[in-house]
Amino acid sequence: MKPFPWKCGTCRQHGLVPAVVDYQTEIAHDGRVYPLSLPALKVFQCERCGAIVLDDEACKKITAALRVTAGLLAPEEIRRGREALGLSQEQLARSLQVDQETLSRWETGGQTPQRSMDQLMRIYFRVPEARRFLEETATFSTDLNQPPSPA
């Protein structure tokens, strides 16, 4: 974000002030719409028109609320699951057939995985037979400049 003070995106005037609001929204994720309610969310609000501006911290809280509401793994759960198996990000990414940077974004909260990937990670972390199968059949190269290896 740009340094404070910001202009209001609605009325284009300077005059955003810190505020605490009971924030309600609906967020679409993976083909579903989730209603979210975040009481006492710290935001910035325009003194002139009342518009709300979300900073990075507010966006992180909204994303965390989405994960809870949708029943998705939290970033730290993904990281702990990987570490409990003694895997590097590269190893887990290869088994899940995703790019290592994608897995890194899931673990840091920068991106929310789709429900199908969330379920695949849960199975991978909990079911040794599924883990072995995915490791044996991993044909996706995490280097996007390399073609997939033969099966």
Give, region by region, the residue ranges found by the protein language model:
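Residues immediately within or flanking Cys/His clusters that coordinate Zn2+
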Residues: 3-5, 43
